[in-house]
Amino acid sequence: MLIGVGTDIVQIPRIEKILNLYQELFAKKILTSQELKQFTLLDKPNHATFLAKRFAAKEAVSKAFGVGIGQGINFKNITIINDNLGKPVVEVSSHYTNKLIPFHIHLSLSDDYPICIAFAIVESNCSV
């Protein structure tokens, strides 16, 4: 059963400006420790795109839950990792998921400078 759909678009140059001002403080604000490990392994020119995609993905996922970032869920509650084929996989912290019925999240990410987009679908694992 469909719980919700969310999407978000981010201008990569906007993230570049934020990185120039705040450097890695911004990354530490929106990335989980697992994502930060990935981030630090990237070449510096790829930092803005990585952050833009994670920002868009987390916004899209929060919108699919119907709450938005800061309204019961925050950036640190959502981790975006990639499987062996590069597919984005979403993990939501147990602090948040304990309040919900079992669910599965589908996420699609795409970027074509200067834009990146995320599209998320949340569905319940329960049959009605």
Curated annotation (Swiss-Prot):
It comes from the Bacteria. Its main location: cytoplasm. GO terms for molecular function: holo-[acyl-carrier-protein] synthase activity; magnesium ion binding. GO terms for biological process: fatty acid biosynthetic process. It catalyses: apo-[ACP] + CoA = holo-[ACP] + adenosine 3',5'-bisphosphate + H(+). One of its GO terms (cellular component) is cytoplasm. InterPro entries: 4-PPantetheinyl_Trfase_dom (IPR008278), 4-PPantetheinyl_Trfase_dom_sf (IPR037143), ACPS (IPR002582), Ppantetheine-prot_Trfase_dom (IPR004568). Keywords: Cytoplasm, Fatty acid biosynthesis, Fatty acid metabolism, Lipid biosynthesis, Lipid metabolism, Magnesium, Metal-binding, Transferase. Its EC number is 2.7.8.7. Its cofactor is Mg(2+). The keyword Plastid does not apply. Signal peptide: none annotated. The keyword Magnesium applies. SUPFAM superfamilies: 4'-phosphopantetheinyl transferase. It is found in: Cytoplasm. HAMAP family: AcpS. Belongs to the P-Pant transferase superfamily. AcpS family. This is Holo-[acyl-carrier-protein] synthase. It comes from Rickettsia typhi (strain ATCC VR-144 / Wilmington).
